[in-house]
Amino acid sequence: MRTPVLWLLLACLLSACTHTQQSIMTDTQRLKQLDSLAPIAAQKPHSAQYHGRTLEDPYFWLKDQEYPVVNDQDILDYLNAENAYFNRFLDPQRDLVETVFEEFKGRTDEEETSVPFVSNGYEYRWHYRAGEEYRTRSRINMATGEEQIFLDETTLAEGHKYFSLGDWDISPDNRYLAYSFDTAGDERYQARIVDLQTGEILSDKLDDVQGGLSFDASGKALVYALLEKGKWLAKNIMVHSLGDEQSQDKSIYYEADDGFFLGFGKTSSKQYFLIVASQGEVQESWVIPTKDVYAEPVQLVSREAGFSQSVDHAHGYFYILANDTHKNFRLVKVSDDDPVLENWQTMQAGSDDVYLLSLQTFDKFIALKARDKGLENIQIIDYVGGEHKVQFSEDIFSASIGVNPEFKQSFVRLDYESMITPESVFDYDIATQTLATRKVQKIPSGYDRSEYQTERIMAIARDGTQVPVSIVSKKGYKKDASQPVMLYGYGAYSATISPSFSTLRLSLLDRGFAYAIAHVRGGSMMGYQWYLDGKLKKRTNTFNDFVDVARHLVKENYVAAGNISISGRSAGGELMGAAVVQAPELWRSVTLGVPFVDVLNTMLDQSLPLTPPEWEEWGNPVTDPEAYDLLKSYAPYENIQRTNYPPMLVTGGLNDPRVTYWEPAKWTAKMRSLKTDNNLLIMRINMGAGHFANSGRYGRLKDYAEEYAFVLQAHGINE
């Protein structure tokens, strides 16, 4: 049962201060650096030649040449010095951090329980025990009523500074549990198998697992993706027979091209394993019967066809979302006897307005998530041509297909929220077309939805494009430029930041902030073309959109220039770097979470396993001088100038395989050496975690509280 790995947002930050509409934050009003000396990283000459150009990088040494091992003492000394400097900033802010943390904790249901789901005669759920960081998972035998705890994450996490459950699956005979876990944050999972009848942990030990795992139909074999030694890259889909050594495992698919990501899953019918190799806008799909896992894979779509697809299966047909004939995808079906492209039958044609996002097949219907002119909806389609949309009470919301492991169920479980509506779980009855509420997020310290308001506006970018902006604030927020705004953005890989709910965000709204999400190009809020218009040669549209959204908010009196704090993570951290370089005068503070700011050097470094697959997103500066010049022109790290910049908080993880630790470190070192202001610049590197920072729920809240304290201090708020 796939545990979604959440890699996004830091709920972002800010606080309250008054300014006139025309005011620009002056240097004397900024959050200042500490009296103690900030760490100064050594500059060591390093240059390389590309296409007749010389690339100088005096902080190249911050990448340990033995990576992923980091033992260079000079590097460790610098990172530890930055952490010590960060802690010196925190020392006088401990009361504020604790206040914010207690607010977060007060909104956390300490004994939260999931809505149970039924699978193969058992009812499954997870719950938290009060005070514990991790979940406990249990199941009830529906025939006997006997309850069994099968995964106690708190116990598994004992003795580890970091713990993350990757995936788990139960064998079809309900006897065996397989689960994967990561204790370093490097996303190289280990897998174990438990006999649920006896409680015995089998001798089977799998290392270097990508994360996902799934039993075949017999329950005697386990499918997983194997990471290459020393690289965060899977090239083999493996089958492990219970009782064997891992060295005996067999590869059922090998990906020869380092430029393709490899993954797998199981169809809702449980009849096929689906193997997908993907590179940017191109995917190749293969299927293997779950009853014969060593059978020759059957190709559904070749990479040469040059398009993306999502696949599920029911009643002898594959159902596929594909953007072969329209960028926003069409829905097709094809017999599993001969699933070649020529036999595909269109069920729903592609549309300029409706972007088809995901699907799940059931016995009697298909659930389909779509976005119509930027607004989400769930469609229900039966196998004889009938269809309708699920009706929700709000116009702007986030809805997705939830956990639905049973193929033969008469309802679809949906997850729902909006910027003012807490997370909810509904069961939608297909026959009666009614929603039954199964769960509403509990906020123990209290939440009154009527006290808050949300809206969507369109900001005009410099090229005339209308960019959607989702905004939430407390009622009474004055559009007279007197209150602050927190602006969040991402804008890459077609990922869309939906208008969702956040209990953390309330600590900003209750202090007078408006919180805005800029749905910039590079995401896919307005369709697949929205994504295409923010990548490769059009990448700078993403940065321009974000800055232009901020300027639109100033123009429309939501906020004064210089009273906007901004935040983004990963590729959103790249966006923050680009925004601060392009328009430093606009920002009150900048939070760059695990920021992908050293884009050019990373795309030049073929030793990094993620570099070749990423060329389809950013361009290949190794072979293409035009791509090199473009990346150099906008890469945030390359474009730091000798000028004034706003206060900044930078975060990273030593074991992060996605955005390596040296990117935030190099950014911080270079920024500190060039900026001409006296504003605060601090960096927090988690020395025992990766891309997703602290793994426990309270540890994460503490991280967020520290980040909020930085932002609140930047706005002059001390309580």
Give residue spans per PLM region.
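Positively charged n-region of N-terminal signal peptides that target proteins for export
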Residues: 1-4
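Beta-propeller folds
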Residues: 7-411, 415-423, 427-432, 448, ...
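Glycine-rich His-Gly loop
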Residues: 128, 417, 488-494, 570, ...
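Secondary-structure transition/capping motifs at alpha-helix termini
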Residues: 143-144, 184-186, 197-200, 216-219, ...
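Cap/lid segment of the alpha/beta-hydrolase catalytic domain
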Residues: 154-168, 180-186, 200-202, 428-434, ...
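Alpha-helix capping and helix-loop boundary segments enriched in small/acidic/polar residues
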Residues: 165, 205-213, 228, 232, ...
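Active-site lining segments that contact anionic ligands and/or coordinate catalytic metals
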Residues: 270, 282, 308, 315, ...
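Active-site-proximal cap/loop segments of hydrolase catalytic domains
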Residues: 517-719
